[in-house]
């Protein structure tokens, strides 16, 4: 049997695929041999017959080599390229041709380089260095916030997107904690809480920290459902439910006892737009005015919108609204369709994963992408409180381009190796 498997695996060019394939073939042969033993054959003869029935190892190996090799998701790469170009075009009316060419175009090219580099890397390293990667990220963020990144009005804009890198790192941490039972779940919950505090500290944004908390809780539940921490799934999920409910109630109480804070006032203004339209609710008046005066094709006719100071617009966080106003509703629909196609490509990658780490890493990247897409679009049409948002391809800046390039690269890396890495090979 060993010689048969060696000849077979020698035909497979991808070295990383050999171990998993050898294990699969070995299990299949042993199962068949066991069936022959139960039928009355001796062990050696049963094993010999099972090997003979497998056929020519060279032909089988060549056939498996066609399947178990790295693959590129060209569809997702194409959608990424189209959205990158569309994003540059959409930014031009807001920031000008000189800015787009001198800065954002460079960020886009660098981003594509990062996508390719991460795609070619072995994402399974996250399953071995997740905890160490989290510590390194925290050190880098601490140094960056203190000495490098620009702080504006108490906030560090770059950190509002960079902290999302904690999410795929958490996927690697969960994989490291697998098979360790309830204690690992409790530790994972503690890591989620610590990450929330760190994200809040670095980004100075409750919404960003909340988004990260949400993504990490979903990842933890997914890991439990997959049986990574044992079979007592219902108890573990109830434990997480209690923690999430308690924290939600606690933060709700904090907001209620701090009604005069700007966060609470902006939230109240979202539900009482007419009453607060000259104060915190002026954002929603601008959004309503822009949408009301937009056309199906071409630029809208609201000088009020163009001249009004709107931080979300000047920073590019609400670019979908600007696209609708400057290019028309049809352009907005096309842009939305492209984003939907991109998200569907990501969903397809997540859905196809069979090994635990690939499933968690792809899910982590997908969650960050979809949360920011949905949140940014809803904000742009006035269906969500105005807050910090970084929509993929539609928010300017080097940090945004870098983070989304890493996430897209990880998705492509998972897809590239989905027919190579088995659970045992990781």
Enumerate the predicted regions with their spans.
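Soluble N-terminal domains of membrane-associated systems
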Residues: 1-77, 81
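A juxtamembrane structural motif centered on a specific transmembrane helix
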Residues: 174-191, 376-426
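Transmembrane alpha-helical segments and their membrane-water interfaces
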Residues: 101-126, 162-181, 218-231, 344
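Hydrophobic alpha-helical segments of polytopic membrane proteins
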Residues: 190-196, 207-255
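Loop-to-helix entry and N-terminal half of a specific, functionally important transmembrane alpha helix
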Residues: 349-387
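A structural signal for hydrophobic alpha-helical transmembrane segments in multi-pass membrane proteins
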Residues: 48-148, 192-195, 329, 366-370, ...
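Hydrophobic, glycine- and aromatic-enriched re-entrant/interface helices and adjoining loop segments
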Residues: 234-332
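Hydrophobic alpha-helical transmembrane segments
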Residues: 106-114, 325-346
């Amino acid at each position: 049997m060993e010689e048969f498997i060696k000849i077979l695996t020698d035909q497979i060019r991808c070295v990383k695929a050999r171990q998993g394939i050898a294990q699969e073939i070995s299990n299949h042969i042993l199962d068949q041999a066991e069936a022959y033993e139960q039928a009355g054959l001796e062990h050696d003869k049963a094993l010999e017959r099972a090997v003979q029935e497998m056929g020519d190892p060279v032909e089988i190996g060549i056939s498996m080599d066609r399947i178990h090799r790295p693959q590129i998701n060209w569809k997702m790469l194409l959608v990424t390229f189209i959205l990158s170009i569309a994003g540059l075009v959409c930014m031009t009316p807001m920031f000008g041709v000189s800015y787009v060419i001198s800065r954002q175009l460079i960020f886009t090219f660098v981003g594509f380089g990062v996508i390719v580099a991460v795609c070619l890397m072995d994402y399974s390293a996250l399953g071995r260095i997740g905890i160490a990667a989290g510590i390194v990220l925290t050190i880098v963020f601490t140094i960056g916030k203190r000495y490098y990144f620009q702080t504006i009005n108490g906030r560090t804009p770059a950190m509002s997107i960079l902290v999302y890198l904690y999410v795929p790192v958490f996927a690697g941490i969960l994989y490291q904690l697998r098979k360790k039972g309830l204690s690992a779940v409790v530790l994972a919950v503690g890591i989620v809480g610590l990450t929330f505090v760190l994200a809040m500290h670095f980004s100075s944004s409750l919404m960003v920290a909340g988004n990260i908390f949400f993504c990490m809780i979903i990842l933890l539940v997914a890991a439990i459902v997959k049986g990574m921490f044992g079979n007592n799934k219902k108890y573990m999920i109830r434990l997480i439910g209690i923690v999430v409910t308690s924290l939600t109630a606690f933060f709700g109480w904090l907001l209620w006892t701090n009604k005069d804070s700007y966060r609470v006032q902006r939230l109240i203004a979202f539900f009482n737009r007419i009453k607060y339209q000259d104060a915190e609710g002026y954002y929603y008046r601008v959004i309503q005015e822009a949408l009301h005066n937009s056309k199906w094709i071409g630029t809208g006719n609201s000088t009020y919108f163009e001249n009004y100071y709107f931080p979300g617009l000047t920073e590019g966080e609400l670019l979908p609204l600007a696209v609708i106003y400057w290019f028309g509703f049809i352009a907005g629909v096309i842009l939305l369709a492209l984003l939907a196609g991109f998200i569907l490509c990501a969903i397809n990658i997540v859905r196809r994963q069979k090994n635990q780490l690939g499933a968690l890493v792809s899910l982590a990247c997908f969650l960050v992408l979809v949360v920011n897409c949905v949140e940014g679009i809803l904000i742009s049409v006035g269906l969500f409180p105005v807050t910090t948002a970084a929509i993929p391809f539609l928010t300017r800046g080097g940090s945004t381009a870098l983070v989304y390039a890493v996430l897209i690269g990880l998705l492509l890396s998972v897809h590239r190796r989905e027919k190579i890495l088995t659970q045992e090979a990781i």
